[in-house]
From Swiss-Prot:
Species of the source: Pepper mottle virus
Post-translation changes: Genome polyprotein of potyviruses undergoes post-translational proteolytic processing by the main proteinase NIa-pro resulting in the production of at least ten individual proteins. The P1 proteinase and the HC-pro cleave only their respective C-termini autocatalytically. 6K1 is essential for proper proteolytic separation of P3 from CI.
Disulphide-bonded residues: none
Xref: SUPFAM superfamilies: DNA/RNA polymerases (SSF56672)
Annotated protein name in UniProt: Genome polyprotein
Segments for region (Disordered): 115-155
């Protein structure tokens, strides 16, 4: 005697669609095949439904990849009756699978889809259930509630509130809100991607290509040059007033590169271009400190005494929300000290303007200077 469930309950297992993945749906139908053993017609109906289901998407793609599970009748017999499969059965089974066409034909079985009748799901239960459906209902997590734990008491649920609701005051134009809250709830861009302290990606691409063309080097050689430029900028800064050449070491040999293409093509500024190297520069300083004490020149000039803050001691470091408070304070203090004595003048001396006055002053050798006369030894100031 093999204990069996009611046929109606097994049908529910095969038609239930609460799986997050399509593979889980197929596994549930195979479980229904196992439970239906002993009901020959029900097993056949489930197999027919499974065959039809594998022709639909996304299950057809899973079957083509060989990931669709299946339970053979010989496996069920081994499971329930512990009867091994002999060689003759395997031979007949193999020949049948070779001879079968894609269309599987049955003698007298019929499959009923889209039925309108309701059936009793249990012997003593009077609850009605939905009939077996031939169409596949798309699985979605939206709108579904969590299963109720039968071991708990009460039916109270904890309400969830939204961080942004439609009841708050919002900017409006002609009586309509100008914001889309659904998009705003999901819109969380990276700070560095929208920060105006670094150049945009298109500006960086333009600068990179312009420098490569100016240096007349290939795509494969350019990353090596960028390595040297980043290390040089860590030591010497990214001031717009730098000129001349920058140096990269090739072993013990110094290789010079002109700074003009680097500075002239940097838009908006060289510091905003080099901000793209901030994370790599920080990791580079940390790597150097693992081998030997290393403090960038930016920190040495500011007399930074804490070696643990060396990774923040370069002027194109990008301060983010993840920057520690102590490191942020040290970086801002170093920046303030560097800018304290700096003076920026909008206009310099205009060399295109000449004087229109005629100088009638006459001086002799006794005069102290071209702009100062003497009178009997008395100097007129």
């Amino acid at each position: 005697y093999v204990p069996k469930l009611e046929e109606e309950r097994i049908v529910i297992y095969s038609t239930m669609d609460r799986a997050d993945l399509a593979e889980h749906r197929l596994e549930a139908i195979c479980a229904a095949m196992i439970e239906s053993w002993g009901y020959s017609e029900l097993t056949h109906q489930i197999r027919r439904f499974y065959s039809w289901l594998l022709q639909q998407q996304p299950f057809a793609s899973i079957a083509q990849e060989g990931k669709a599970p299946y339970i053979a009748s010989m496996a069920l017999r081994k499971l329930y009756m512990d009867r091994a499969v002999d060689e003759e059965e395997l031979r007949v089974f193999t020949e049948m699978m070779v001879a079968l066409d894609d269309e599987f034909e049955c003698d007298s079985y019929e499959v009923h889809h889209q039925a309108n009748d309701t059936i009793d799901t249990g012997g003593n239960s009077k609850k009605d259930v939905k009939p077996e459906q031939g169409s596949i209902q798309p699985s979605s997590n939206k709108g579904k509630e969590k299963d109720v734990n039968a071991g708990t008491s009460g039916t109270h649920t904890v309400p969830r509130i939204k961080a942004i609701t439609a009841k708050m005051r919002m900017p409006k134009s002609k009586g309509a809100a100008v914001l889309k809250l659904d998009h705003l709830l999901e819109y969380a861009p990276q700070q560095i991607d929208i920060s105006n302290t670094r150049a945009t990606q298109s500006q960086f691409d333009t600068w990179y290509e312009a420098v490569r063309v100016a240096y007349d080097i290939g795509e494969t050689e350019m990353p090596t040059v960028m390595n040297g430029l980043m290390v040089w900028c860590i030591e010497n800064g990214t001031s717009p007033n730098i000129n001349g050449v920058w140096v990269m070491m090739d072993g013990s040999e110094q290789v010079e590169y002109p700074l003009k293409p680097i500075v002239e093509n940097a838009k908006p500024t060289l510091r905003q271009i080099m901000a793209h190297f901030s994370d790599v520069a920080e990791a580079y300083i940390e790597m150097r400190n693992k081998k030997e004490p290393y403090m960038p020149r930016y920190g040495l000039v500011r007399n930074l005494r804490d070696a643990s803050l060396a990774r923040y001691a370069f002027d194109f470091y990008e301060v983010t929300s993840r920057t520690p408070v102590r490191a942020r304070e040290a970086h801002i203090q170093m920046k303030a000290a560097a800018l304290k004595s700096a003076q920026s003048r909008l206009f310099g001396l205009d060399g295109g303007v000449s004087t229109q006055e005629e100088n009638t002053e006459r001086h002799t050798t006794e005069d102290v200077s071209p702009s100062m006369h003497t009178l009997l030894g008395v100097k007129n100031m």
